[in-house]
A protein has these predicted regions:
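Metalloprotease/metallohydrolase-associated module, dominated by Zn2+-dependent proteases
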Residues: 6-84, 88, 105-186
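Active-site recognition of the HExxH zinc-binding catalytic motif
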Residues: 92-104
Length: 186
């Protein structure tokens, strides 16, 4: 990882952890202790590979035979989160992964309650859906469809000109994305 990426990721870590430090319940008790936050700050964070392009973030056990914990996990984030328009959302994704790191494996009620501590959670969901759509577009295959006879050619690139015709019947071809459902967030 080059210096620039390293800086971006450590800044993000710092931002998220300093927000987590101020989350308190109605008795003014903190949700995340200093010790937990210290452990979280030591977790390796890097970028997702192209194979997991449709995910926003992913937490995995380092040792698959042991339970998920701050000392037994690593976090990967989608590189697209570091485009300026997604920067605030990136904090939310890392927060989500940090909740997993603390041993909350599934998205159960307790998990969602912690997740809801994040400010502007609704806005985060909206931006999240926008990112999902963008990632789906990148992954989509394209179908050149003949408007006259219905003939379909699949293409992996969106490169297309509006004046393409089907050789056999001379119908005009249209370019339609084939969108597959993305894997669940985790
Ligand atoms: Zn045709
Ligand atoms: Zn998750």
């Amino acid at each position: 990882m080059d210096d620039n990426n390293y800086q971006i990721l450590s800044q993000l870590r710092e931002n998220v952890i300093s927000k987590m430090r101020i989350f308190v319940d109605k008795n003014n008790e903190r949700f995340f202790s200093d010790n937990e936050l210290l452990q979280l700050s030591d977790i390796e964070v890097s970028f997702l590979s192209r194979n997991s392009i449709s995910r926003h973030g992913l937490t995995t056990n380092l040792d698959k035979s042991k339970k998920l914990s701050p000392s037994n996990c690593k976090v990967k984030l989608n590189k697209k989160l570091f485009e300026e328009k997604y920067f605030l959302y990136a904090e939310f994704v890392l927060f989500h992964e940090y909740i997993h790191c603390l041993g909350n494996f599934s998205h159960d009620k307790n998990f969602r309650q912690l997740e809801n501590l994040w400010p502007e959670k609704k806005q985060m969901n909206i931006i999240g859906r926008q990112l999902t759509r963008e990632l789906q577009e990148i992954k989509a295959q394209w179908a050149w469809t003949c408007s006259k006879c219905g003939f379909v050619v699949k293409r992996s690139s969106r490169k297309f000109r509006s004046n393409y015709f089907h050789k056999e019947c001379l119908g005009k071809l249209k370019n339609i994305p084939i969108i597959r459902p993305t894997s669940l967030e985790h």
